Amino acid sequence: MKFDVLCHINATGCKPSSLYTAVANQMLFSKPSKALIRCDVSLDAPYIMVEIEELAQLDRQTKCLLLLSQLLENLDIATLRKTSRISQIVFVLPQDELNNPVISDDTLSELLAEVISQQIPDFIQTTTLDLKSIAPDTLIIALDSCVSYQYVSHQAKNNVVQVLNGPPGIINGEGGCVLLTHLQGTLSAHLYNGELNEQLNQAEACVNDTYLFAGKESLAWQKKWFANTQALYSPEDELIELANLNNTIGHQGVANDPAGFVLANSYLNNPLNEGLQHVFLLFNSPNEQLIKISRSENS
């Protein structure tokens, strides 16, 4: 899959260089919530989240609408269509607790009509993105806000959420991004199959590679990662350090996978990393997935 990252919004701002600097230096934008969630049978504690300051105090739907409006404004679809073919638009957007879209298709049509004067391309709305079957010339617009008490308390029923002074868990955030898959894309993504250790073998991964983790943090995951990478080490090697996207900007919900591609772009297009040939992007939800991202030959 060849692609370009067109724009993004998260707690670090809108510039790839700011995102790279923040993640590479493990900068923290997180804060404890005012509300408490149940951690176990005997403990309530604030959860840790990363909120975009300008969106604080707003409800999830309003946040998502503002994020979408800003992405469309930054994108300039009308100009983009003059230089790039767009066969379809895929909106990766959240649903509410009743499994209804947070942003309706009618609203999406209205927003697109405001920014595109000519015929609007076909679009679909989904909550998941199948990275192995994305067609070329697809414009992917993904966003979510995952910091509300309602969202996190529901999430905590099936996941380990990071709470104040608690064990490793998911830090939630909010943001969005836009990708375009096309044959002239400046970045190329190669996905591997099988169990995590098999994927690492297929990729010929080594301890000196750059690994970007954009998944759900937990102690169980850390143990699994160490177990699967043991074979990569020789006695003198230092421990692999995962650049952790979600510890910096928070887990982006349904937009988390595309956000990982934004991070990879920020690493490969940073002047400080001119000699960096590729990075390995790593997801662990719903399954472990290793993706090698490199600069395209035609870029």
Where in this protein do the model-derived segments appear?
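Conserved "HGTGT" condensation-loop signature of ketosynthase/thiolase-family condensing enzymes
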Residues: 1-299
